[in-house]
């Protein structure tokens, strides 16, 4: 969805969005039940994930019984708050191994987020993407306002679990 702004090679080399510190576990992507079920069993990727309902207390008020999150918190090896744990489906050489039909929507639109800001849905930029930076440039704004934003809003209507609570410092694009 963002290929005109971010190349697959750039993202595969960076991998920032695919690893999580303890304080960023709220950012772990959510999977629809049918995808989580497929990925927790032997599958075409040769990697299985451990999933839990998103409503198990690890997320905000917009969670849904119809979403699952990867369980990553048991993968930390130290007590260091800066330690990062990669997504189960991240290959160190190739990047994400999931095909588009299995990739969470959150991942497809990152570093964009749909957020609830005071009861209004907004499209915001995650300010920590090393390739985009903390301020949206004209190309990104044009992409969002030129149709991608509406696609994200439409997806959120049928998948409300992708909506996150707004956090200060996330520039609103739309």
Language-model segments: residues:
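Short loop/turn segments that flank or connect secondary-structure elements
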Residues: 1-174
């Amino acid at each position: 969805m963002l290929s005109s702004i971010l190349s697959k090679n750039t993202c595969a080399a960076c991998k920032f969005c695919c690893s999580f510190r303890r304080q960023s576990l709220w950012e772990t992507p959510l999977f629809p039940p049918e995808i989580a079920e497929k990925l927790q069993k032997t599958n075409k990727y040769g990697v299985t994930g451990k999933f839990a309902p998103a409503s198990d207390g690890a997320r905000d008020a917009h969670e849904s019984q119809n979403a699952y999150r990867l369980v990553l918190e048991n993968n930390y090896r130290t007590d260091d708050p800066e330690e990062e744990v990669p997504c189960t489906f991240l290959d160190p050489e190739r990047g994400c191994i999931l095909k588009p039909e299995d990739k969470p929507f959150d991942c497809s639109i990152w570093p964009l987020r749909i957020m609830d800001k005071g009861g209004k849905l907004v499209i915001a930029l995650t300010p920590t993407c090393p390739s985009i930076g903390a301020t949206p440039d004209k190309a990104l704004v044009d992409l969002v306002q030129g149709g991608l934003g509406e696609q994200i809003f439409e997806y959120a209507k049928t998948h409300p679990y992708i909506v996150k609570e707004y956090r200060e410092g996330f520039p609103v694009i739309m």
